Amino acid sequence: MNKKRRLEKILDMLKIDGTITIKEIIDELDISDMTARRDLDALEADGLLTRTHGGAQLLSSKKPLEKTHIEKKSLNTKEKIDIAKKACSLIKDGDTIFIGPGTTLVQLALELKGRKGYKIRVITNSLPVFLILNDSETIDLLLLGGEYREITGAFVGSMASTNLKAMRFAKAFVRANAVTHNSIATYSDKEGVIQQLALNNAVEKFLLVDSTKFDRYDFFNFYNLDQLDTIITDNQISPQHLEEFSQYTTILKAD
C-alpha cells in the first residue's frame, strides 16, 4: 500500500471514532511502528490531526461517536472485512443503494470509497457511513435525518421513516444482531423499523452478518429471511447453519 493510500485509510479510521492508536494503525495496515509514526507526523503537518501519546485525534470540536465495547472490538475483524468485500462486488455502476448502520456496513463504506470507476448513489441513516463517503467524487450521498442514536450513530424515528418511504433502491444492505429460524432481529425497534422500510423499498435485499449471529435472539424482529434475496456471511458458518438457513434464502460465503 503506497503512502497516499495509507494516509487516506488512517483518516477514514479516525472519522469513525475520532481517535486512533499507533497499534491500531499497525494492525490494520500491516506496517511498522516507525512508518505509522511518520504517517501521523505527515498528517499532523498538513493540519489534519493532532498527535497524542501513542496515537492521534481528529482536529474537531465534535464529540466522537460513542460505540459499545463490542463494536470497538469487532470493527475491523477479518470476517467483517471479507463480508464487506463480497457485498461491494455486487454493486454495479449506476446503482442507487441503501446502507444501514453497523460495523460491517462501515466496512462496506470503506470498500466503496476505495473503488474506482463506478458512479453510484448512496442513501444512509448511518453517520459513520456518511463521514467515510462524504468526500467521494464518485458517490452521490444522502444522509437521512431524524432522531439520533449515539450508541450506533444511526438516525431513526418518524422523520427518517417519512423520508425513506418516498425512496426506491436497486439494493439495500442491512445488518442484524440475531438470526434465528425465519426471523431477523435487532436491539432497537426504531432501528429495526428503518431497516424494514429500506428493505421493502429495494429491488434486491441483502443481509450482512457474520457467522456468530446465527441461532441468536434479540428484542425486535424486523424481517423474515424468506423475504430477503441474499445473506452474505463469512466462511466460518457451520454446515448445520448453512443447511438450516439456506431453506429460507440464498447464502453467499465471503472468501
UniProtKB/Swiss-Prot annotation:
One of its GO terms (molecular function) is DNA binding. This gene was sequenced from pMG820, a laboratory-derived deletion of the naturally occurring plasmid pLP712. It comes from Lactococcus lactis subsp. lactis. GO terms for biological process: lactose metabolic process. PROSITE patterns: HTH_DEOR_1, HTH_DEOR_2. It holds the Pfam family HTH_DeoR. InterPro entries: Carb_Metab_HTH_regulators, DeoR-like_C, DeoR_HTH, NagB/RpiA_transferase-like, Tscrpt_reg_HTH_DeoR_CS, WH-like_DNA-bd_sf, WH_DNA-bd_sf. Residues 3-58 form the HTH deoR-type domain. Repressor of the lactose catabolism operon. Galactose-6-phosphate is the inducer. This is Lactose phosphotransferase system repressor. SUPFAM superfamilies: NagB/RpiA/CoA transferase-like, Winged helix' DNA-binding domain. Keywords: DNA-binding, Lactose metabolism, Plasmid, Repressor, Transcription, Transcription regulation. Residues 20-39 bind DNA.
